């Protein structure tokens, strides 16, 4: 029905293009009028455009500067400050609207200017990545359309070879006129450097500065590159610089400007494929135990071997039953246990290709999944552990726990989590147990739960490493390190590690050095990072299949740009075989046939392992070829350059699909162009389309086909019963192949199923991260304010006023003047004790004002007693150090909350709703802690010379040792807050003297110093 409407009324993309066509005509007419101008006159037109933008925006900028100065005045009253802040918010919106309007007005002239500049540059010789290039690019009409779409903040889908890199220069130039900086995001450093050098002539012609951010650059170099009008770089570099800027100690350490406009090249790779992996800056965990995996590894290896033997037994039983009673339910149950016990078992996978086997297993599984999987436990109970390959989870069974308890010579209970709620309830209800003993017993329950929980988590991660993660598929081992391989591109991801201890488990499995455990210091997801930009756009050859996700997550519309020349590539239906062996043999025979003909062929694979298997088979037949995978990526440019030559055979993982153009050699066009041979369907249709797109660029001929087997991952996990039924009905013999459009469509349906599942994962991740993102914005805004403002006195005094009221309110009901005196001495080091009768008579407001004035007088005396520069340092240090420390702790608490929140679903609660409520409560606690500790530090910090600092640290160390030996009374805890500074030593010759911390409270998650055994936040840390 939809197709009928599209034929009558036209598709969405046709309507989008139709609207833009008149603008393209205007651009071309303007460009023709510029042809008579000299180069200097053309440059002058560019200067004029910039001046018009400046003239439009200058009044708004001047008003903003004036209002900001007023806001910095320490004598400004609250009402006036609120009025100014409201106007600043409105002004920001007006500024963006004015910017959009003037750029829209200047678009035709600017695009015409860029096009004419490209004409002038024709024949210009320059270097790109050390190779001599001659400029021969002038935008076609379809490229102008692509540029207009990008400027509009949308995604341009442009076929391979249509010149996306040149297209980007048009909106980049236009938006660079604002002087706010434009970011062009690529997928790797090589492409960032190449594109910057490749496109720089058109920008240099008009004196626009161009920079590039590379992984090896130092902060000062990065700052210079970000100051340019246009900056190229990768999403990781831009994202990590954002996180590092929000950890900076001084404004001079920050490298980025504001986030105005970004164009993301290969936008589907960056915003979708990378979206499941958050950017994380982590630091080492103090006193972390890295031997925990080594201790349990021998047990797990024996457990895995026992499971393999058990699986082999079930396979044998199934084979016997099938010979005598085909379709026997007992055979189906045995095979289902094999699937749940060792899903990647090669014998099992081969068996599935036999007639009726896949259907038998699927039918049995459906039977046991009925009634909310209530009977699946009957299947799993006979195994040592159960593997759910789709969900990527592993559960230890009672049989597995018994096995481990015998190996470890310990009770099997140590591999089970205690019921904390029941245990605590029993302790609480026992009237015979003294209060102090109750606290101790409850702490023992919590400690037992934590120990067992960690042990079970480590066991689960090791089992995953042995059962679900295969070397040369999900990862490779290079130079004694486990390196993750990108599932979408086949590239190695240096520096990236699996989370939750999984990477350490794989390191233990592979007998390489287990790297230290880390803790998160700063994190952001790709989705939320790119939402920081005022305007975002993207370009790729494959976005249409993910259009709904782009719009739902990023509010980005996808516009398919027509090709300059019609695509004549011939895309054939999939060829389906029963087994991988048959498929590989067919691939080799096809490659041999094509090479004899002279037609170049690119064989696409989904993993390093498959690429090397095919390479061995080709070598055995003496077929000369190149291999491009995660192990040979250093020759990428050279291999890709040769891939379109006559007789060329290239085997490549998906890494050959991004940022590369394969140009045809002499005589290849007549042979049919480049032949794309996919050795397996990827789980994403986009990746398959990207592979096909290597052929047929700019109207070149080409062919593409996929060879598929029922043993492939996609078919095994998500292949439709329909494909299996057709194969069974036709009764295909070994080596036979099916080629039919129905099969191809069924495979695409399976891919769609996986894409939907992955989308739901990414969407769920974003829903969770949105909670943290709102908190991150508040914290980073406060931190940036503390970093950039010269004086923070007014902020400190605002905190003091709120604090004064809180303290007085807390103790007014009981008229506890002694508690007020003790709290103020402890937290602010000031003396204040109201008379009891006066306190009762004057009430909260008047007493709070007295306290505020007393504390203010103390603070003013402190200010007068030291140089202004030192006081500024103290205030900044108080604000920044507390925010950094507490934010790190908060991230750790949020991580812990996320790990266990899904278990709430068993209690008929929505985990996301529970997470939002818990995270909000934690955040309120965090803000309270930050405000109190910032105020406390600002009052109690004094500069000391090095000798005094050493003497003070020694006193504190001795005091801490004494404290450990004491069993302090519960009430006396608040007098023992002594600890040395966590800050590194500073070179006093190179930087101003740093304030030393005279006192520091325990962390919220540390044990309370009172000896109660509770966490500090649940004990004496509850006080304001």
Swiss-Prot record:
Main localization, broad class:
membrane
**What would be one Gene Ontology cellular-component term for the protein?**
cell envelope Sec protein transport complex
Q: Which residues bind ATP?
A: 143, 161-165, 661
Q: Mind telling me what this protein is named? A: Protein translocase subunit SecA
**Annotated signal sequence range:** none
Classification via InterPro entries = Helicase_ATP-bd, Helicase_C-like, P-loop_NTPase, SEC_C_motif, SecA, SecA_CS, SecA_DEAD, SecA_motor_DEAD
Function noted in UniProt: Part of the Sec protein translocase complex. Interacts with the SecYEG preprotein conducting channel. Has a central role in coupling the hydrolysis of ATP to the transfer of proteins into and across the cell membrane, serving as an ATP-driven molecular motor driving the stepwise translocation of polypeptide chains across the membrane.
Lineage of producing organism: Bacteria, Pseudomonadati, Chlorobiota, Chlorobiia, Chlorobiales
Broad EC category = translocase
According to the UniProt record, where is the region Disordered?
A: 970-1024
